A protein has these predicted regions:
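Short Gly/aromatic-enriched secondary-structure transition segments
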Residues: 40-47, 325-327, 389-391
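Conserved PLP-enzyme active-site core in the AAT-like
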Residues: 5-14, 76-283, 297, 404-405
Length: 406
């Protein structure tokens, strides 16, 4: 793909109020006006460059939104206080009572719970389907469908969505394709493949330091302005406002995203290849054995690799828990949810990030008890990490040591 997101970010240049190399932080909740008429015009949306109240917008949030739009290649972007804040705002902006959504069945547990449990209160229907099966997606679409939703790389099974094909199907039915690209910033550019709206949890790779919670909606100017409408905008009225200080820190961390994503992907590929050679059940989109490998190769940005997430299936929850506890004890990472941190994070999604999904549905979609999701860190010597992880696997009898010939 010719789209150069990292160059777009590098070309952004802001000056602080006193000439600083970082833009000044707008540390105010409300803003003054020299005339009452200007305040009125700002309420009406008829003034450029004026700020009224930080739930509406703030300079720090607009700077970050501009950078995220450059990252995804969209016209603009609205930042939110969490990824779920972004997802819920988009859904309630697009859907009214009686409408319908077609969603991937393998999605983040919080999104699943929102769609299956909470949206009932608004009489919004949901069909969960295997979005890698285009026929199943087409059959699920009804005249009431107002949105097709998927994750570029799914949480936690790492299924790869054929975004271009899904986009064609969505356009054929005059519905927007909404893609959560949290797992694959830079690696995949959904808007360039036909997605209408791109969502991220900024908490993960984009921020990269696991010290804040934030989200974003990337899309057209019309859609994002609609989200901020003071009378009808779901983003405005639900009030998921990102703090200016956090917006500023995320913007600074974005400057190293291209370097970090390359290293996350490089390390994940090394571990996935070697553990697969060892005979373990590994899922990683960069492996030829991955069912979505060809789709991933067709749409990924090669220089950023196949992403920093991989899974290992060690056979049982007991073994998974024992392995994670031992790896943490050996300083190989943290037994923690989330992803995109500079140190490796691991969790058993069936009992954590996907626990909102009923057990029978977990099994139906292939989410086994022994599955461990790894967010691979920025280890400088990944071969050293591999050997230490392998020692843990051998110690717990998950992996057999090679026979030693005398």
């Amino acid at each position: 793909m010719d789209f150069k997101a990292a160059d777009n970010l590098q070309d952004l240049q802001y000056f602080g109020e006193y000439g600083g190399v970082n833009p000044s932080i707008s540390d105010s909740s409300t803003y003054t006006f020299l005339s009452a008429k200007t305040m009125f015009d700002t309420f009406e949306g008829n003034t450029e460059g004026c700020y009224l109240y930080s739930r509406h917008s703030s300079p720090s949030n607009l700077y970050l939104g501009e950078a995220l739009a450059a990252l995804e290649g969209t016209e603009t972007a609205n930042v939110t206080a969490s990824g779920m804040g972004a997802i819920s705002a988009v859904i309630l902006q697009l859907c009214n009572a009686g409408d319908h959504i077609v969603s991937s069945r393998t999605i983040y547990g919080g999104t699943y719970a929102l769609m299956k449990n909470f949206l009932k209160k608004f009489n919004i229907g949901i069909s969960f389907v295997d979005t890698t099966n285009l026929d199943a997606v087409a059959m699920a679409i009804t005249p009431k469908t107002k949105m097709l939703y998927c994750e570029s790389v799914s949480n936690p099974l790492l299924e790869v969505a054929d975004i271009e094909a899904l986009s064609k199907l969505a356009k054929k039915n005059n519905i927007p394709l909404v893609v959560d690209n949290t797992f694959s910033p830079l690696s995949i550019s959904p808007a360039k493949l036909g997605a209408d709206i791109v969502i991220h949890s900024l908490t993960k790779f984009i921020n990269g330091t696991s010290d804040c919670v934030a989200g974003v909606v990337c899309g057209t100017k019309d859609f994002c302005l609609g989200l901020k409408d003071v009378n009808n905008g779901a983003g405005m009225l639900l009030g998921s406002t990102l703090d200016s200080l956090r917006a500023s820190s995320i913007l600074k961390n974005m400057r190293t995203l291209h370097i970090r994503m390359k290293k996350h992907s490089e390390n994940a590929m090394y571990l996935a290849k070697n553990f697969e050679k060892d005979g373990l059940r590994v899922v990683y989109p960069g492996l030829k054995s991955h069912v979505g490998h060809k789709v991933m190769k067709k749409q990924y940005n090669m220089e950023y690799g196949f992403g920093g997430l991989m899974t290992l299936d060690v056979g049982s929850l007991e073994k998974a828990n024992a392995l994670m506890e031992l790896m943490q004890k050996k300083h190989l990472g943290y037994l923690a949810v989330s992803l995109g941190f500079y140190k490796t994070l691991f969790s058993a999604p069936g009992t954590s990030t996907s626990s909102e999904i009923p057990l029978e549905e977990q099994l139906e979609m292939g989410l086994s008890n022994g599955l461990i999701r790894f967010s691979i860190g920025l280890d400088d010597h990944i071969d050293r990490t591999y050997m230490a992880m392998k020692d843990c696997l051998i110690k717990l009898d998950i992996l057999k040591p090679l026979s030693i010939k005398v």
